[in-house]
Amino acid sequence: MEWETLLWGFFGVVMAVVVLGGIGAVGYMRKENGRYTAEARRWAVLGQSGQPVEAVVRNVRMHPNNMTRGGSRGQTVCALVLDVAYTDATGTARTASIPTFVEDALVPQFLAPGRIVHLRYDPSDPASVSIDRTRTPLELPRAD
């Protein structure tokens, strides 16, 4: 009888570790996804009221775990961080790191050295930037 108790105890510990690990993984994925989708939420606001500006991509970083997800039309989008340099309306040189999702087919275009991207920034908070999706698409247009 005692070996059965030990076996059930071992099984319980293993299952607890699996469940807790799964909960931790889901929490991590939600946090990371939120970090990259925050830029899209800023675009919803800055697309209407933000100041347009051109920026130069200085560096592109892929997510360390190559995070991808489904895009707005079912395509695959990849998590990237674009390190950009731009000059605001007052003439102040600024830099920003913009975590966002880019369709996998467009990723090579962002890897080109010195690529120009179009941004919108908040004039009252120039550090709050978003990619101007009307001028620098992050997803390919689909035929309807």
Where are these regions (language model features)?
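Oxidizing extracytosolic/periplasmic lumen-facing domains
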Residues: 2-144
